[in-house]
Each structure stands twice: as C-alpha cells, then as structure tokens.
C-alpha cells in the first residue's frame, strides 16, 4: 500500500506536480476545506478501507482540483474515520463527486456506513495551503 503524507505548501507549490500526482490547482476563494466524519459498521471496516484507499489515491492522482485527501481513524475505535479533504473550488468538488471513481466508492460503501457528517471548515490562515504527496 502507498504511504500518503500531508505537507504544507505555498499557493505556488500547490500548482506543481508531486510524485505520482497530477499538477494541482491553487485554492480559490470558493475552495472547500472539509472534515468528513464517518462511522463504519465493524464487520465492513476492512472492505470499507479498500474502497476509501482507492478513491483517495485515484482522486489525488487524476483530479487537479482535489488538493488533499488525508484519512485517519480513532485510536480507540478504528470504525470512526475522519478525512481531511480540500478542494480548489466548488467546481472541483462537483467534478469530484461526479467522477466514476467517487461514484464507485459511494455506491459500494452505502451499506457499510453507519453515519456520515460533512463538516465544512474555515482556514484560520488562508495563506497556508495544504497539499498531499504520495511516495
């Protein structure tokens, strides 16, 4: 499995191509910073993680407007998953959720998800940009 790491970078860096990824757009004024809080039924956790890993990797590799996909799970309860997602713009998000790889993830995991909260965030320092890179 590939390691996914998170790094901070300037808006100029956000436009550069990182190893294994397409060139990234800079965050626009209407960009999205979101925490997706997901609770997965325990019996589906392993299967869910396969879907989530695939959609994250494909999104970062192929979608210029998907800037960050960083998933973590709770140390005490691994069925509680939080994903930090950043999108360059509202349009980039619309393109992401319409993509074949996202639809495969969404339809394939509907029965696995016990609860979902989408929590949009406001950056404290908009000059800081987040971007992922893959090794």
Question: Where in the sequence are the language-model features?
Answer:
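Glycine-rich beta-strand-turn "strand-cap" elements at beta-sheet edges
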Residues: 10-30, 70-77, 106-135
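N-terminal targeting signals for Sec/Tat export/insertion, comprising classic cleavable signal peptides
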Residues: 24-54
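N-terminal start-of-chain detector that recognizes signal peptides
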Residues: 39-45, 53-58, 66, 89-93, ...
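Short alpha-helical
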Residues: 43, 54, 76-78, 88, ...
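An amphipathic, aromatic/His-enriched active-site/gating alpha helix that lines ligand/cofactor pockets
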Residues: 16-19, 58-67, 86-120
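Bacterial N-terminal signal peptides
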Residues: 1-9
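Short, well-ordered beta-strand segments in beta-rich or mixed alpha/beta enzyme
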Residues: 31-39, 68-97, 119
